[in-house]
């Protein structure tokens, strides 16, 4: 590199020459100058801008120089040199450090060796001196056969008596117990006060008092060792030498003291702990200096003599004073009192005070920190926090449990705010959600679906039967939008809707109330305010009612959906299973119903909505919804009302009307008065009263709510009028319902003539209310048709009210359809503003409701009407009309808002004027009108027959009452029917239909047939959907209406009816004549399907098996009444209307299985009716239900048992795993503890063994060879034989003399000179001077052979072992050091290489290469010029 530097300089000079002085000539860069160059260059270049910015013409050449390979090579070489030099310096430093460390260690070792050698030499010299002295003594006393007792210490000067030492205070020691005068001087001179007088040493040796233990023994051994070793030092000459070594020993002792504090923790600490507390060491003020140096109080004096390798630690531990020990422990173990932190080491100490401190220590930390306590407290606190949220959650679910208490339906009844707001919400949403709530049949089907195949087959049948209902429910969402209007007023509706039980209960109560309530009761009811009051628990109702209640509560999918669904459920909630359950649980459910009703009242309290509907409108919605609505307050009551218009209204009236009729609904005074004479009047009054309260409730309660309550109480009314009512109440929402509208239309048409005066009132109310349009439509219809009062009167007079109702419905339909059918939108928005739509709904509702509800109403309501007002004039048709009218009037009244509603039947007469006989007002309807009415009746019958469950429910409920039974018997009698009706419909037809509907066997057959013909339903629907509308539209003209009025007045309804049937048959060109004739008589007309309102608003008559779920086809919203077989009247509340019909027919009965309506072909209707069911099909549904329930229970039990067993099995598995894990952990923990204990024990035992072996080695007598040459017994051997007393004789005497002396190999451990006296041997006769000594203890056993050889061999072996250990340790340490050094060197090389590369790369920058500073010293100001440099000099960079 040195050679290359000049070249580099030359190259730079040559390259830079053009620039002249502008650029300073770079100087060779050496590593040692780099640091200096950087600042210098910076100072030189950067101050001047002209230098900083190179001329542009010179930049290319400079750049070429910088980029040249030679220049880069130079830079790299320079850098390598610098880095190499740095590495060399680092390595040299490291090596020097290592060498110094090694030298220090070697010097320390040398010093230690020297000290050890000095000690060894000193001991040897002392031994040699002692032997010399002993030899001199023996020579002086050769005449005495004296076996040298080494344990007796004689004073050097013989004139001094020997110092007697007791066994308690002295171990075997040297002969001389007192240092010679000569040694005292040096000792004092070298280490003043450093020597420890023998007395002190003796007094300090109190180890024998210690309790024997392994550690104590070890200490004894160590102490003994020190004594044995120290004995050699305590000869005359030892004192001085001990002092000489004193300084060094003091240092050594200091080190050992430190070791005591440090390393002694392991072994010495344990010894110290065990010994110190047991033996209070006496610390004498002998060596204060040494005490300072080493915590051992008197360790120094002896340590100087006893620095042998083996006993080093033991001696230190032995002499430690308690204070020192405490210090040591404090240092070594945190358990010492000084240490505050409780350390696990502390417990190891055996000091009594240390352990207590340990305990206290632990307790104190616990008190201070309180980790466990704090943790516990915090945990406890946290737990409550967690718990609180948990508790809150249940509270949140409170509404749920409230529900559970009362039942699903009752849940919304809770008085909490939730009900209120929920009601409103649900009422709003209920329109869309009504379909959510599955009907009881659907639930049963779902339940069965989970059961075996047989049950699933049954479930399929049920689902098929319920199909219509389901469809209705599906279509109901469209209509539901209207319900929100009321929903706002009735927040609790949603809750009621959500609770099926409520609806069911209402139905049941209604049924019960039906008996109790009378027309007068309805009259009594002043306003819907009664709804608010809690209805008294209704008497036990029929099992069907109970079943409905039960079935309804089963599910509450959504509060919103619940309203519609509940209503629908109320209608079809009665499933066979539920019927069975109801029968068995009738009483219980009645009680529940009463309770639920109470709750409902509260819930429905908000039903009173400012929305004012025309009485007519209210009558309709209230007919349906008043039953429903009133039941909401008292669901059970109202719902029964709708099934039996009269009974239902009465029942509703007891609960709701008792409180008072709503303002809109005026008590049907006039109407009741006019109708009081006839059962129809009574029915109408009761219905009116019910409808009025219902209307008010409808206002307040969401339409869905009304629908719910209505299904049970006013299912028929709901279908006929109730279905339309919702549209009227909620014209916008409800109008879409075509089927309900058709029913409503039919009902309204039929009852419009009767309700015409109410209609007028309705008009007035409509004008008053926002829904005047609805009222206007009814008013228009009513104006065309005879007044309600007149119609009622006519009906009372006319033999067949059913026909009249049909005709009236036709007339009203004819009048209204023109207006209503014109706009489907208006019909859909019935409530909103379209009078025509209201009328259309009424018409449609009348038609569809009539078609559906009429069959039930006629069969059921007629008997009721007759029973209430036993008027034989009211024939089966009339009774049907009464029911239909009850429903129709409400339907019409809805159009005429509250006026018609309140006065539609009973109120129309009261509020406005008792309806005079409508004969003059109503023109006798023409044959076409009659045919249309018959067709509507047929449609109603078909609808009712399509849902035999509803029909049977109605029949069961009505037939259970005496009045209804009477009315039915009258209807079946020729006198009531009349010759014309008999001709049209054979007398036995109705009875046969009733019997079939009422017989489970027939019902099963009908269901099976309906199912088998399920494929025909859609086709028939399609084929006949538009026929009924056409027929009805064409049938009722003004002339026909006049003819109908005349026939009603003159009692010629029979002839007119027959003619109208013929005309209708001709017009329709279908099987209507046959089916109609049969259907009209039996009220079970199969041919006419319920009228369906299309989007256009035109009525489409679905002929054919309308009874079956014809497939609700709501063009926009309303479901065809034909769908009524299982569908709701209103498309908005299709389920509700269907349910309403079903419940109206049997609100209390559970006829859910029959929900799927039979599609009776008009042609085959007769055959079906006449045909007897086979024995197999006559199997009791109850039995079937029992079997199903039993199977379901069994399956559930099996499934639950399996689940429980599986869960238990899983738990067992988990428990097994946990137990195994825990047991394994415990075993491992115990094993670990055992290992630890074993290790400790082994270590302790090995240490003890080693220390014992070493102590023995040290205690072995070091026999020095005899120099006198005599072999008599010159060897000073000690043998392990106890001597109480022995006589030492001269060795060369006889054997007896020798035997008297102690054997050579067993001298005593301690001897005391008792005295000397001449003694004569009795064998040899020699008299010898003898010394009597007393020996104590036991010496070390030895071999009779010479000890010097063995001692020397052992010493040699020990030294060799030490040397070998030293060599091995040195080799290992050297290897380890070299390996670590090599690793560090490799790491350093790697780091250096990486750093070189990084540094080189970082330095090879534009500024470094072209800048003013050195290549690796970038100026601090580079940032200022970097951008400029890059931009100017290195545009490409």
UniProtKB/Swiss-Prot annotation:
<dbReference type="GO" id="GO:0007338">
    <property type="term" value="P:single fertilization"/>
</dbReference>
<feature type="region of interest" description="Disordered">
    <location>
        <begin position="848"/>
        <end position="878"/>
    </location>
</feature>
<dbReference type="InterPro" id="IPR000048">
    <property type="entry name" value="IQ_motif_EF-hand-BS"/>
</dbReference>
<dbReference type="InterPro" id="IPR027417">
    <property type="entry name" value="P-loop_NTPase"/>
</dbReference>
<feature type="domain" description="IQ 5">
    <location>
        <begin position="1361"/>
        <end position="1389"/>
    </location>
</feature>
<comment type="subunit">
    <text>Interacts with calmodulin.</text>
</comment>
<keyword id="KW-0677">Repeat</keyword>
<feature type="compositionally biased region" description="Polar residues">
    <location>
        <begin position="861"/>
        <end position="878"/>
    </location>
</feature>
<dbReference type="InterPro" id="IPR052318">
    <property type="entry name" value="CellDiv_DevSignal_Domain"/>
</dbReference>
<feature type="domain" description="IQ 1">
    <location>
        <begin position="84"/>
        <end position="112"/>
    </location>
</feature>
<feature type="domain" description="IQ 2">
    <location>
        <begin position="1190"/>
        <end position="1216"/>
    </location>
</feature>
<feature type="domain" description="IQ 6">
    <location>
        <begin position="1390"/>
        <end position="1413"/>
    </location>
</feature>
<dbReference type="GO" id="GO:0007286">
    <property type="term" value="P:spermatid development"/>
</dbReference>
<feature type="domain" description="IQ 4">
    <location>
        <begin position="1240"/>
        <end position="1258"/>
    </location>
</feature>
<comment type="function">
    <text>Essential for spermiogenesis and fertilization. May be required for manchette assembly in elongating spermatids.</text>
</comment>
<dbReference type="Pfam" id="PF00612">
    <property type="entry name" value="IQ"/>
</dbReference>
<feature type="region of interest" description="Disordered">
    <location>
        <begin position="332"/>
        <end position="353"/>
    </location>
</feature>
<feature type="compositionally biased region" description="Low complexity">
    <location>
        <begin position="422"/>
        <end position="440"/>
    </location>
</feature>
<feature type="region of interest" description="Disordered">
    <location>
        <begin position="416"/>
        <end position="440"/>
    </location>
</feature>
<dbReference type="GO" id="GO:0120316">
    <property type="term" value="P:sperm flagellum assembly"/>
</dbReference>
<keyword id="KW-0217">Developmental protein</keyword>
<feature type="domain" description="IQ 3">
    <location>
        <begin position="1217"/>
        <end position="1239"/>
    </location>
</feature>
<protein>
    <recommendedName>
        <fullName>IQ domain-containing protein N</fullName>
    </recommendedName>
</protein>
